[in-house]
């Protein structure tokens, strides 16, 4: 059947209009863009460390697997970031040019699912504001992260890996204390 060009064009127009709005607001404030980008990185990293070290270490596998799959999807989709169409000076703290899917959104959504703290959801919003991601990148990434979490949980629960890993890790920690 193929892709529906009308839907794709409408979605792109929505993406474009939202990004254009933020570009107009921030185009002369690149220092603010840098600060906002730094905040989004700090929020995501702090939640990852909190989850791994204070909630459950085995979630590290969820983050590693989701990051690897996301990276592969970025290579396959090869979608350009919004700043590419507006102003390349917005390419602050960007290591590659692929927009889809949004790793920040996936990490933030997984962190929200695990902790229930809504504060972490500011990271994907900030990535849209600073022209690092299209709105559709973030929306699809939310769905993708829910799929990652459900798949990870079902695999660990089905095979009983979760409990045996926690017991092993607790013994390892006690042994070296």
Predicted regions and their residues:
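Hydrophobic alpha-helical bundle signature of multipass membrane enzymes
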Residues: 1-98, 106-127
């Amino acid at each position: 059947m193929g892709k529906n060009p009308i839907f794709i064009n409408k979605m792109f127009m929505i993406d474009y209009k939202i990004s254009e709005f933020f570009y107009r607001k921030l185009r002369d404030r690149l220092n603010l863009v840098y600060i906002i980008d730094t905040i989004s990185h700090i929020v995501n990293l702090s939640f990852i460390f909190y989850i791994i070290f204070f909630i459950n270490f085995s979630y590290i596998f969820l983050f590693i697997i989701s990051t690897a799959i996301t990276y592969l999807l970025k290579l396959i989709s090869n979608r350009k970031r919004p700043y590419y169409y507006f102003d390349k000076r917005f390419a602050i703290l960007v290591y590659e040019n692929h927009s889809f899917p949004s790793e920040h959104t996936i990490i933030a959504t997984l962190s929200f699912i695990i902790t229930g703290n809504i504060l972490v959801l500011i990271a994907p919003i900030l990535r849209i504001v600073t022209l690092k991601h299209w709105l559709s990148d973030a929306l699809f990434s939310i769905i993708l992260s829910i799929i990652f979490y459900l798949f990870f949980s079902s695999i660990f629960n089905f095979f009983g890996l979760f409990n045996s890993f926690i017991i092993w890790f607790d013994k390892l920690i006690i042994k070296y204390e």
